[in-house]
Amino acid sequence: MEGPHTRALAEHLNDVVTGKMVERILVPEHRWQANMLLLNCVGQVVQRVRSHGKWLFFDFSHGISWVCQLITKAKWAIVPTEANEKYLTPPPPPPTPSRPHKRHRPPLITVCFRAQTSTPPIVAILTGHPAFFILPTEKVWAHPEIRALGPDPIGSPDFHDDFPYRLRQHPTRTVAATLLDQEIVAGLGNALKCEILFATRFSPSAKIGALMASQIDRLASSVVALVATATTFAGKGLPFPYRVYDRAGLLCTVCNTEIAVDRSGQDAHLSWYCPTCQPVGQEPNLFSA
């Protein structure tokens, strides 16, 4: 899940569960052996849900945070009220299946939140295989995976200073590769990378060392603008209107040139781009479609 979708999810969860007390937590015994650190959050109040890049943070009133990255089809979801009982009933031990890959898997975590005893509970479920840590809130940024993250385009107030500085430490790398480096900028995926390159007129082969200061500043502004726009679309459940990503062979909406694909990236990510609209740093590419 890319940063904009993670932020939109964090904002939704924050609206729904902040200020609510954790009434129950169900953890399938065959998975996590009723992890006591997790269950110690029962009776605590959610202070806020926030995000940084592709990571979610649930901060609780007793100084503990859940830190979660939704990878490998992992997902947080709020259960419709009418389905609460289905998820609040502890699942039976799983039978030995004849075809394990067809087995229905229960949620990894089921959390029941409640504001008042007279109101229906709010049930949230975590499914899939996320990266998940339980940490003291004050030490979250000391965790190696979190400490290594670069600035968040719309969550870090010093982004316009920090991002260019980190970028300039890699003069021989392409802009395309650095935009996917989570230690340089947190939350970008390949789709937004392609759109940012298009917005700034940078070729996928453009090198950091060849950019002027004004071009790097323009790149930083485009990153912020496109991440903010993508977050708005994600929050409304709308598809992002991509102009180059995954549009190989279609005509550019600006100049009518066919969208091409650059396959030369050493990180194995494809870059969709317009050869006419993105001349900055363009080099002969023997691998174009």
Model-derived segments and spans:
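Acidic/polar residues in short coil/turn loops that connect beta-strands
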Residues: H62, A115-T117, A268
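Generic recognition of long tandem-repeat/solenoid scaffolds
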Residues: L56-F60, V111-F113, W272
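Short secondary-structure junctions
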Residues: M21-R24, Q44-V49, I78-V79, T89, ...
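Basic, nucleic-acid-binding surfaces and adjacent catalytic neighborhoods in DNA/RNA-processing proteins
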Residues: M21-L37, C41, R50, D162-A289
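General N-terminal leader/first-domain-start detector
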Residues: M1-I25, R31
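N-terminal functional module of multi-domain proteins
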Residues: H5, L9, V27, Q33-M36, ...
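A short, compositionally biased
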Residues: S51-G53, R103-T110, D246-A248
